[in-house]
Amino acid sequence: LWVGALILVAIIHVKVLPDEKIPDAKPYQKFFGRYITFFLIGQVQALITALGDLFYIKIQCHNPFLFWLACACCSFVFTLFMYALTVAFENVGEALAVVIMVIQVAGAGGSFPIEVLPAIYQRIYRFFPFPYGMDALRETIGGMYGMTYWKCLGILGIYIIISLLIGLVIAIPFRKLNMKIEHSKEKSDIML
């Protein structure tokens, strides 16, 4: 789901160009208006992933509805996070999303138990969204344990707030810097 969100920000423009029909659109309106596209495509991706896991791969799942719900929540969080990074930092945000993905794949406990990973991963893995998404999905597959599933989804909700802060607040001071970087890239005739 993270890779799908990353591909979305790579192939769909996040910048909303001025429109004659809506000249007074506020930055937050542009942010949410464009994000709807990312959200809908991400939800289709989550549905296809969940249905593929359940009916094509035929995983054993104690609660298919909660499995889909966890996929949908992960997709929402991941697409919003990627979108916010890209809105705030443009190409640097995309690169940052790739770096975060690599760190999470290596050290979020999905490949190997976190206890056998290097100490640095043991210290930082809980600051990333992957472990909470994986734990929520694991709960629906292996059986529910108390409120762990809902706790994981709640923690993923914190990343929604972080994403909104990045995309709506932190993006403001970076607009001029992003314009300078974009202008510099255009002058170089090398980069897209």
Question: What are the functions of these language-model segments?
Answer:
Residues 1-192:
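Membrane-spanning alpha-helical segments of multipass transporters and channels
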